[in-house]
């Protein structure tokens, strides 16, 4: 199936003549139709859809729901349109598919019209013309997609049938069945447990961070790409770049060696083929000549292949290797895509540690657990902002209970436990720090796993002190989680504060503009530029509002942009060589020396990376990225 989706002020049609010998029977009323404020969906049902029409209907409805939620459309016009494909389905099947799409959309609560099938029709529409107003989608039944997914049905069935046992573990070491735990005072943990146990990942509403990322001109949808691939405006790119630099510096400081590896890999590589079969995922497929490649969904592949070829001694262990993948790819279901929370292309800080044995692996695991807490603290997320999940087998719990309890003690609050009777995955122990957002959806940030399979699968060995080659254990660690997820968590946290009447703010080191200088008139613009120059020389991101707006409007504009410090300069400040500063954090305003402000800002940003201002100095020189 092929669909063209156009967000329109209106769509109207009028039947002119038969296009088929036996078109759909229609009443006089159905010969004309009109809907306003509508998502117009032009559909070609294709021959391949005949293999599984029910699945095509379901996928099409999910895609339409996804787009409708993004453009906030309640009215949907289903319009048969044969001109999107040269391989059309039989008319009777095509009509049935269109009817099913119409009916299921109605069941989802949409106001739906469908243009009649098998006729020549005149139509008019008025496209709204915003970035998401014109989109196309291709729906492929799984019978066709199966060759690309390369996921053995038996393995998927085995994973689906895996039974999880859920508990809450307290810092005191008490393991309580989740339905018997008193969640009083642990509301976010309750929400997280419900989310994990239900396993529902469909996003039915737009999370607040999407509004913020658009209003602040940070990130936007890219209609020219596949859904889940985003565009970053200058301010968003600065935040993302600083986060990338910060996490990388933390991991290198921890002792990891930074590498770079390819983004695509051969399906037929023996080690990779085994890994794919053991670790089902939805891949993007790339063909080069007769060979088929998949786009990586993690840095594991490249780092494992480097380690396979390396000569490693026990003296080198633990051996830590790191890459910031820009990008990793995973074809998430369209209904699961949600702003910065769940994407198809994402930036993943990925460290893999070769450990000699379980004792060394567990010691590293605890260190990386603490490293992850430290990394999140730097971006403004404390243990109060996220919930912990720890996952393992029953045998591992029985043999290492004190170690697991120690993890709960370190975080200082109850944690969610997922336990299995037997091991299905490649790891024996895993934790994640999960952020619960304003829609009660959870997203994993930091994570570490102890992998007991892939050293042997990839042929990764080390020479022990007895001279023999042995297989190590491997830790997978992302101390922050995907960079986009970190941005999502920061914005969602600020949305929560905003709902409580607290002014939202970025951490100062991440603020795209840290100081705005506002001259009260053009005659003191030269002094405003002098102040800005001094701040810029001290590696502080500063801009100057040189527009003709009134002073109050300039201040409101800075408030809307979450500027941490606003400096107002007039004739008095110029004559006395001082500045008047308004702080967003506490609302206080006062006169001070410029050098004192520089010291104040530098004391808060010390130890964090710096990038220069991402936009022109003067506001009058800036483009607007969103209308």
From Swiss-Prot:
Keywords: Aminoacyl-tRNA synthetase, ATP-binding, Cytoplasm, Ligase, Metal-binding, Nucleotide-binding, Protein biosynthesis, RNA-binding, tRNA-binding, Zinc. Its cofactor is Zn(2+). The keyword Metal-binding applies. GO terms for biological process: threonyl-tRNA aminoacylation. Residues 208-507 are annotated as: Catalytic. It catalyses: tRNA(Thr) + L-threonine + ATP = L-threonyl-tRNA(Thr) + AMP + diphosphate + H(+). Its EC number is 6.1.1.3. GO terms for cellular component: cytoplasm. Zn(2+) binds at residues 300, 352, 476. Its main location: cytoplasm. InterPro entries: aa-tRNA-synt_IIb, aa-tRNA-synth_II, aa-tRNA-synth_II/BPL/LPL, Anticodon-bd, Anticodon-bd_dom_sf, DTD-like_sf, Thr-tRNA-ligase_IIa, Threonyl-tRNA_syn_edit_dom_arc. Residues 1-147 are annotated as: Editing domain. One of its GO terms (molecular function) is ATP binding. Belongs to the class-II aminoacyl-tRNA synthetase family. Homodimer. NCBIfam families: PRK03991.1 (NF003068), thrS (TIGR00418). Catalyzes the attachment of threonine to tRNA(Thr) in a two-step reaction: L-threonine is first activated by ATP to form Thr-AMP and then transferred to the acceptor end of tRNA(Thr). Also edits incorrectly charged L-seryl-tRNA(Thr). This is Threonine--tRNA ligase.
């Amino acid at each position: 199936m092929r669909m063209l989706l156009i967000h329109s002020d209106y769509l109207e049609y009028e039947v002119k003549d038969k296009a088929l010998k036996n078109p759909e029977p229609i009443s006089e009323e159905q010969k004309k139709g009109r809907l306003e404020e509508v998502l117009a969906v032009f559909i070609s049902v294709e021959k391949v859809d005949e293999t599984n029409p029910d699945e095509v209907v379901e996928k099409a409805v999910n895609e339409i729901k996804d787009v409708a939620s993004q453009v906030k459309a309640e009215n949907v016009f289903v319009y048969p349109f044969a001109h999107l494909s040269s391989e059309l389905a039989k008319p009777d099947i095509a009509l049935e598919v269109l009817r099913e799409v119409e009916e299921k959309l109605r069941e989802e609560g949409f106001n739906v019209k469908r243009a009649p099938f098998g006729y020549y029709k005149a139509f008019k529409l008025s496209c709204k013309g915003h970035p998401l107003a014109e989109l196309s989608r291709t729906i492929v039944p799984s019978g066709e997609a199966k060759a690309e997914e390369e996921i053995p049905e038996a393995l998927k069935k085995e994973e689906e049938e895996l039974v999880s046992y859920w508990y809450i573990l307290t810092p005191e070491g008490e393991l309580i069945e989740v339905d018997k735990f008193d969640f009083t005072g642990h509301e976010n943990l309750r929400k997280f447990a419900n989310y994990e146990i239900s396993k529902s990942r469909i996003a039915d509403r737009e999370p607040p961070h999407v509004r913020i990322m658009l209003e602040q001109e940070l990130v936007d949808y890219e209609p020219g790409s596949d859904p889940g691939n985003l565009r970053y405006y200058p301010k968003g790119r600065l935040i993302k770049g600083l986060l990338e630099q910060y996490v990388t510096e933390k991991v290198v400081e921890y002792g990891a060696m930074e590498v770079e590896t390819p983004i695509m890999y051969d399906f037929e590589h023996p080690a990779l083929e085994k890994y794919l079969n053991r670790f089902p995922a939805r891949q993007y497929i790339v063909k080069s000549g007769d060979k088929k490649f998949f786009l990586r969904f993690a840095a594991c592949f490249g780092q494992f292949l480097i380690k396979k070829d390396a000569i490693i001694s026990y003296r080198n262990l633990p051996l830590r290797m790191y890459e910031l993948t820009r990008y990793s790819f995973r074809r998430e279901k369209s209904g699961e895509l949600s702003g910065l929370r769940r994407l198809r292309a994402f930036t993943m800080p990925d460290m893999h540690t070769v450990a000699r044995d379980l004792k060394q692996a567990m010691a590293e695991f605890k260190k990386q657990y603490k490293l992850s807490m430290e990394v999140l603290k730097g971006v403004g997320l404390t243990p109060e902002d996220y919930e912990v999940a720890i996952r393992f087998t029953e045998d591992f719990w029985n043999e290492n209970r004190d170690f697991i309890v120690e993890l709960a003690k370190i975080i200082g609050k109850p944690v969610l436990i997922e336990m299995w009777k037997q091991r299905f995955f490649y790891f024996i122990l895993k934790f994640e720090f999960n952020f619960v957002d304003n829609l009660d959806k959870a997203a994993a940030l930091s994570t570490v796993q102890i992998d007991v399979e892939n050293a042997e699968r990839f042929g990764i060995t080390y020479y022990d002190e007895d001279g023999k080659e042995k297989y190590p254990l491997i830790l997978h660690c992302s101390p922050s989680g995907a960079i986009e997820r970190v941005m999502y968590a920061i914005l969602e946290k600020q949305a929560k504060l905003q709902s409580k009447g607290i002014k939202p703010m970025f951490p100062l080191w991440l603020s795209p503009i840290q100081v705005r200088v506002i001259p009260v008139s053009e005659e003191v613009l030269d002094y405003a530029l002098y102040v800005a120059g001094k701040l810029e020389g001290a590696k502080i991101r500063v801009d100057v509002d040189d527009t003709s707006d009134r002073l109050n409007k300039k201040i409101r504009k800075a408030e809307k942009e979450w500027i941490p410090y606003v400096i107002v300069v007039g004739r008095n400040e110029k004559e006395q060589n001082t500045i008047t500063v308004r702080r967003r954090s506490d609302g206080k305003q006062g006169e001070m020396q410029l050098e004192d402000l520089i010291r104040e800002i530098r004391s808060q940003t010390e130890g964090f990376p710096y990038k220069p201002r991402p936009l022109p100095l003067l506001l009058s020189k800036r483009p607007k990225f969103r209308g």
